[in-house]
Amino acid sequence: MSGNANFPYQTHLNILHGPLEVIDEKALSDACEYDWYNQTLCRVNDAVVRLGVVQGEYHWHKHDNDDEFFYVIDGKLLIDLQDLTIELSPRQGYVVPKGTMHRTRALERTSILMVENYGIVPTGN
């Protein structure tokens, strides 16, 4: 899955690294040329770890069966819930519970890690 007319995001669900491989997040983030980029880095049991390099806003969505964890590496991430906005700085994380309408925004280029179930659809249900 990559950018399309409905969702102009670069989303790569292929797993980039296997066990016993070094993952260089900084090199991947520095090489990113997109405003909204999501790359699956590795699989850990039934979950995946994804790198997001983001600027702008994602659409409102929810995941009916899956929680979603966001962790900021660099920049600031805003997570909008229906009546609340969470602001995350580097080294801060937040879990959005399953079934919760949300969207993420970044006013500046921001690098994040996401941990979610292997089969999750990133754009929501």
Regions found by a protein language model. Give the residues of each.
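A short, N-terminal "cap"/entry segment at the start of jelly-roll beta-barrel domains
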Residues: 1-50
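Conserved short histidine dyad/triad with adjacent acidic residue
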Residues: 34-35, 48-64
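Short strand-coil-strand connectors
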Residues: 45, 80-84, 107
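A cytosolic small-molecule/anion-sensing beta-strand core signal
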Residues: 45, 73-74, 89-90, 108, ...
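Short, conserved beta-strand element in jelly-roll/cupin
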Residues: 53-54, 63-80, 115
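Short acidic-glycine-tyrosine-enriched beta hairpin
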Residues: 82-98
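Ligand-binding loop in jelly-roll beta-barrel domains
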Residues: 98-125
